[in-house]
A protein has these predicted regions:
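Catalytic phosphate/metal-binding cores of nucleic-acid and nucleotide-processing enzymes, i.e., regions
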Residues: 1-186
Length: 186
């Protein structure tokens, strides 16, 4: 991962859209890597395509609604436009209808961080990067969800230098665990 693809809790991102773009980029990287490593790669990629279309559809609806409301359009006009957008941009098969067997049920993740420089590093400060990668792996059907019932433990560790100038190496070790050793219910 390049330096610009790392999200650190100490970063001072001035605008929420910059943060959102960075998180989306990292999430997409996680989803791509997850799809490539998944045994049912073709189905996962079809699901990821459907998810991308659904996100585009949702963003288009929000944008169009705001523009039309600003122009003073009636609710009927807005509803008609939303219907047209839905018909033109909806995926042929919704992502929720594309079933893939998850690889893990109850699991823990260890994130090993290998930075490009000897500069001081606190691996847990990369938790926003881990969260975005985990969300991408969730999209790639590695597990049903990354809530407390499924992802029961995360840890971080330093793994030495990456060996490549300007490039970070992040390794996620995912391990299935016995849920009886963790609190997985309310």
């Amino acid at each position: 991962m390049g330096q610009k693809s790392i999200f650190n809790t100490n970063m001072n991102i001035k605008h929420y859209m910059q943060k959102a773009k960075l998180v989306d980029t990292i999430r997409a990287m996680g989803a791509k890597a997850g799809a490539e490593a998944h045994p049912d790669r073709e189905t996962v990629e079809a699901r990821l395509d459907a998810l991308r279309q659904e996100r585009r559809l949702a963003a288009r609806k929000v944008s169009t609604t705001k523009k039309m409301a600003k122009r003073g359009a009636s609710q009927e006009e807005i509803d008609k436009e939303m219907q047209e957008i839905t018909e033109s941009l909806s995926p042929a098969t919704p992502s929720s209808h594309i079933q893939v067997t998850p690889l893990f049920t109850t699991f823990k993740i260890t994130m090993t961080v290998r930075p490009p420089t000897r500069r001081r590093l606190d691996p847990p400060n990369l938790s926003p990067t881990l969260k975005a990668l985990v969300d991408g792996l969730t999209d790639a059907c590695w597990w049903d969800d990354d809530d407390y019932r499924h992802l029961v433990e995360t840890s971080f560790r330093y793994g030495g230098l990456s060996g490549t100038p300007g490039e970070w190496r992040i390794v996620l070790d995912v391990e299935e665990v016995d849920p009886s050793g963790y609190v997985t219910s309310n």
